[in-house]
From Swiss-Prot:
Species per Swiss-Prot/TrEMBL record: Xylella fastidiosa (strain 9a5c)
Broadest EC class assigned to this enzyme: transferase
Cystines in this chain: none
Protein name as it appears in the record: Acyl-[acyl-carrier-protein]--UDP-N-acetylglucosamine O-acyltransferase
Record GO terms (molecular function): acyl-[acyl-carrier-protein]-UDP-N-acetylglucosamine O-acyltransferase activity
Quaternary data: Homotrimer.
Keyword Transferase: yes
PANTHER family cross-referenced by the UniProt entry: ACYL-[ACYL-CARRIER-PROTEIN]--UDP-N-ACETYLGLUCOSAMINE O-ACYLTRANSFERASE, ACYL-[ACYL-CARRIER-PROTEIN]--UDP-N-ACETYLGLUCOSAMINE O-ACYLTRANSFERASE, MITOCHONDRIAL-RELATED
UniProt entry keywords in alphabetical sequence: Acyltransferase, Cytoplasm, Lipid A biosynthesis, Lipid biosynthesis, Lipid metabolism, Repeat, Transferase
Length: 263
């Protein structure tokens, strides 16, 4: 038995066209389908299913029972070739489901690097997740959701299709998102998904200076506390953004919203 074979459990099933780096480990009763590529250092636990076309990067850990790269749960899907792309250093826990894209949605679902995707999380077709995100147990994304870097979804939270979640946002437990969430925003733990302030603690942990946090708070108050119509609030935020990259990011997010801003 060669060294690579010894890293693959004898009960695992590896399709002929799957491509595995020599040090990839595959657990018991796992199925690796056709057109799956898995890069070096990745560990696939027991009872996982990974369907292609799927590309998985380096040093990922699939703990067990995950269903990855399955067909999208979209009635418009007609069997067209679509794919799932997963980056490096992600941890994907038990019973996570991540679906491939659809032809009508760009054809790709993508997961970045260094994400922590916990048990029973569902990430639907055509979603795009950035880097360093956390999805707590039972978090769910409907189709076409875009999630920026450093976002945290608490347990049992979810996002409606086509929503965007800006960088450094925090989504509270049990919250249902039905609009775009601006960067840096904290969404309260209720089913209405109402903004409750900025994610101050998360920003501190990411080494934002007090001055940066104060500027973000000021922009938040302009948008959410001052009682201004959105058009007028955007004008004031634009003034604040002239010499501040964080506020420029916030303003650009607002101006490119495809769904109503969660407000």
């Amino acid at each position: 038995m060669n060294k690579h074979a010894s890293l693959i459990h004898p009960t695992a099933v590896i399709a002929p066209s799957a491509t595995l780096a020599p040090d990839v480990q595959i657990g018991a009763f796992t199925l690796i389908g056709n057109d799956v590529q898995i890069d070096t250092g990745t560990i696939i636990g027991s009872h996982c299913t990974i369907h292609g076309p799927t590309r998985i990067g380096r040093n990922n850990r699939f703990i067990g029972q995950a269903a990855i790269g399955g067909e999208p749960q979209d009635k418009k899907f007609a069997g067209e070739r679509t794919e799932l792309l997963i980056g490096d250093n992600n941890t994907i826990r038990e019973f996570v489901t991540i679906n491939r894209g659809t032809g009508g949605g760009g054809g790709v679902t993508s997961i970045g690097n260094d994400n922590w995707i916990l048990a029973y999380t569902h990430i639907a077709h055509d979603c795009h997740v950035g880097h360093h995100c956390v999805f707590s147990n039972n978090a769910s994304l409907a189709g076409h959701v875009t999630v920026g870097d450093w976002v945290i979804f608490s347990g049992f939270s979810g996002a409606h299709q086509f929503c965007r979640i800006g960088r450094y946002a925090f989504i509270g437990m049990g919250t249902l998102i039905n609009g775009d969430v601006p960067p840096f925003t904290l969404i309260g733990s209720d089913t209405l998904g109402r903004p409750r302030g900025i994610n101050s603690e998360g920003l501190k942990r990411r080494n934002f200076t007090p001055e940066r946090i104060t500027a973000i708070k000021r922009a938040y108050r302009t948008l959410y506390v001052a009682g201004l119509p959105l058009a007028e609030a955007k004008q004031q935020v634009a003034e604040q953004a002239k010499d501040n990259d964080d506020i420029k990011e916030l303003l650009q997010f607002i101006e490119t919203a495809q769904r109503p801003l969660l407000r």
